[in-house]
């Protein structure tokens, strides 16, 4: 079986370093908000290129805390609108609605799969307070035009970087392109913990201070609570593991890019559409999506041939039961993506032989 993601093989590459990190935490006797968190926050902020990094419990919390922070600072209020791509993962939408804000869904482009920046400006209303761009599949969802639009209209530009660790635009990493970035370290990410973990990156000192307090029950001083906060803290164990993994992130991304280059060169089937190829700096290939009108048949065929795949994602947010008031809306490009997308094996431990198996099966699909 060619696995979509072989976490065991990925983990065993640096097992001794992980064991040493875990041993260090155990021997310290300190498991929350300690030296490991401080070290990872410093190293990740330096890697991303921001002044601040706040380690939190998961990627969804990171998204929620950015928006909540802006509400506490008076930048946003209940009922304000946030522009967001219609084809994003549900977490992006949940963070907005959980903050009593209104998601304004904007279509992606079919070629690029990311937010159609040319449609952003027409979606702006007097109630719009921000844009949440999502670097889906590891592909950049930013350009200078988006930055200019947000500046011109006084909007906060927030990045969902859950799938884009290490991706850059003109030398600037995702998470440093806008006003704040939310990061997920779910185990399957390019930079993944051994459990759930997340972070917020920003240059905004005031926002960082508020988010740090909100994530710690709303407290800036022990047992003194300025805000109605939440419990969203990264464990010392996960911080220690992530700091080990961070050293290898760029190398791992290069291996993903090499695999993607082979897929682009070798996949040749008129029934299969590949997304527009980007420069390597603009894509860290969290997933490698392919598209087929007979997607379900293709997935069953690949499974029979010993290739594991996954759909990202079978149901778009506006068709989910939890947002049933949106179910009658029509977003044709989003729906086409969700009807045809199939993710094939993409990670740094896929061998050339395994990649050839994947390509051979795809090319022979009829």
Please give the residue ranges for each predicted region:
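N-terminal "arm"/small-domain region of PLP-dependent enzymes with the aminotransferase-like
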Residues: 1-30, 35, 305, 345
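Phosphate-binding glycine-rich loop
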Residues: 30, 35-81, 95-97, 105, ...
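Structured binding elements
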Residues: 100
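Active-site phosphate-binding strand-loop segment of PLP-dependent enzymes
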Residues: 111-193, 199-201, 343
């Amino acid at each position: 079986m060619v696995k979509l993601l072989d976490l065991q093989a990925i983990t065993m590459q640096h097992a001794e370093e992980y064991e040493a990190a875990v041993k260090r935490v155990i021997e310290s006797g300190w498991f929350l908000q300690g030296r490991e968190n401080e070290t990872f926050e410093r190293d990740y902020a330096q890697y991303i290129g921001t002044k601040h990094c706040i380690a939190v419990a998961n990627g969804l919390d990171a998204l929620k805390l950015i928006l909540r922070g802006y509400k506490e600072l008076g930048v946003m209020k209940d009922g304000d609108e946030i522009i967001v791509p219609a084809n994003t993962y549900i977490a992006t939408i949940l963070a907005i609605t959980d903050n009593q804000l209104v998601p304004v869904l904007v279509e992606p482009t079919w070629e690029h799969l990311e937010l159609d920046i040319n449609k952003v400006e027409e979606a702006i209303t007097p109630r719009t307070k921000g844009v949440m761009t999502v670097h889906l599949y590891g592909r950049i969802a930013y350009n200078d035009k988006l930055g200019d639009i947000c500046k011109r209209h006084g909007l906060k530009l927030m990045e969902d970087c859950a799938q884009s660790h290490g991706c850059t635009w003109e030398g600037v990493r995702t998470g440093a392109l806008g006003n704040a970035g939310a990061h997920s370290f779910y185990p399957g990410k390019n930079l993944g913990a051994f459990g759930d973990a997340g972070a917020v990156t920003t240059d905004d000192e005031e926002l960082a201070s508020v988010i740090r307090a909100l994530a710690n029950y709303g407290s800036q001083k022990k047992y003194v609570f300025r805000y109605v906060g939440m419990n969203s803290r990264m464990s010392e164990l996960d911080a220690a593991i992530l700091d080990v993994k961070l050293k290898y992130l760029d190398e791992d991304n290069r291996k993903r890019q090499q695999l993607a280059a082979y897929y682009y060169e070798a996949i040749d089937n008129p029934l299969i559409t590949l997304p527009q190829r980007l420069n390597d700096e603009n894509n860290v290939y969290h997933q490698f999506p392919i598209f087929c009108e007979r997607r379900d048949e293709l997935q069953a065929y690949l499974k029979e041939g010993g290739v594991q795949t996954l759909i990202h994602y079978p149901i778009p947010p506006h068709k989910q039961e939890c947002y049933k008031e949106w179910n009658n809306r029509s977003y044709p490009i989003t729906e086409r993506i969700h009807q045809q997308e199939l993710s094939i094996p993409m990670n740094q431990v896929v061998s050339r032989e395994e990649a050839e198996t994947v390509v051979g099966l795809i090319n022979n699909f009829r």
